[in-house]
């Protein structure tokens, strides 16, 4: 059995940079034969402001992965029972994969890790695209195409199910029953994200001397409520308030600030993962 890992483009300042090597290593340690399908390295490196990827570059990256999947099927490298893991479930390539798998009669098992989408009112798609039919039908199709859909929190599953699969209906007597059935049969999977590396990565910064520093470690996006942080700074002049995304920090520089800070601030309206709080803890 082969495991084909359709990875997410790595942004050095985000956890996706660490996933680039950590996720394949985890799968190999578990005894799997892993082949990573990555996109080109010459895509724009800067993320779209407030996002964790570049909206143009991500399509270049994903399109290359679709081509690679097609060539794997054409060369006979994909066998019945192989697994495909998408570290970003919002990937149109899952449709191409199902097309090839079913028409060529090579059944494979598909896995997708969900981060966000139009169903999340705080995400870019939710704010700028909303419930337009094209995006809602696309996301429902992605969900249906994956055998297993992974979420980091129960909150995320509930939001996804209510806003997307239940179309935001106020009352549906079968909503909870439908969701429970999907959890039982593995269509929904609540699981921790692969971040075992964090303990070792952050250990060197653990006992650093603290100073009067308060960090805002989040993306600058409406649901993060940065205005509260900036207002608080005017009332506590004895502290240094730093918005990390304003600083163009490397990962090492960011971790040094975490080690020195007395507090990590959050007034986030929601968390579907909470990576900054993971790191701050």
Q: Where are the language model's segments positioned?
A:
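Conserved donor-binding/catalytic core segment of Leloir-type glycosyltransferases
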Residues: 188-224, 230-234
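Membrane-proximal helix-turn-helix segments that form the acceptor-binding/catalytic region
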Residues: 128-149
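Aromatic "clamp/platform" in nucleotide-sugar-dependent glycosyltransferases that forms part
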Residues: 269
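Active-site proximal beta-strand in glycosyltransferases
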Residues: 83-89, 102-124
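Short alpha-helical donor nucleotide-sugar binding micro-motif in glycosyltransferases
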Residues: 256-261
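Short alpha-helical segment that forms part of, or immediately flanks, the ligand-binding pocket
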Residues: 255, 278-279
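N-terminal pre-catalytic "stem/leader" segment of glycosyltransferase-like enzymes
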Residues: 1-96
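Donor nucleotide-sugar binding/catalytic pocket of nucleotide-sugar-dependent glycosyltransferases
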Residues: 144-203
């Amino acid at each position: 059995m082969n495991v084909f890992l359709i990875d997410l483009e790595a942004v050095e300042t985000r956890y996706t940079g660490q996933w680039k090597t950590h996720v394949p290593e985890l799968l190999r340690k578990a005894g799997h034969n892993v082949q990573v399908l990555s996109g080109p390295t010459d895509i724009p490196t800067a993320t779209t402001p407030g996002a964790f990827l570049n909206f143009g570059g991500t399509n270049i990256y994903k399109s290359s992965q679709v081509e690679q999947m097609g060539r794997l099927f054409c060369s006979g490298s994909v066998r019945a029972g192989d697994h495909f893991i998408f570290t970003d479930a919002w990937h149109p390539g899952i449709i191409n994969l199902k097309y090839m798998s079913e028409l060529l009669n090579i059944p494979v098992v598909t896995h997708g890790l969900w981060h966000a989408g139009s169903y999340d009112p705080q995400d870019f798609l939710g704010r700028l695209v909303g419930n337009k039919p094209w995006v809602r039908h696309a996301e429902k199709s992605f969900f249906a195409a994956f055998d297993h859909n992974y979420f980091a929190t129960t909150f995320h599953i509930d939001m996804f199910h209510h806003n997307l699969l239940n179309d935001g209906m106020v009352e549906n007597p079968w909503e909870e029953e439908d969701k429970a059935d999907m959890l039982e049969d593995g269509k929904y999977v609540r699981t921790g994200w692969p971040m075992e590396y964090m303990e070792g990565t952050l250990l060197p910064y653990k006992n650093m001397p603290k100073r009067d520093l308060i960090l805002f470690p989040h993306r600058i996006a409406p649901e993060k409520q940065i205005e509260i942080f900036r207002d608080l700074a005017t009332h506590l002049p004895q502290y240094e308030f730093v918005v990390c995304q304003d600083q163009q920090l490397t990962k090492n520089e960011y971790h040094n600030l975490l080690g020195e800070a007395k507090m990590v601030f959050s007034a986030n309206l929601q968390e579907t993962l909470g990576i900054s709080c993971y790191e701050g803890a």
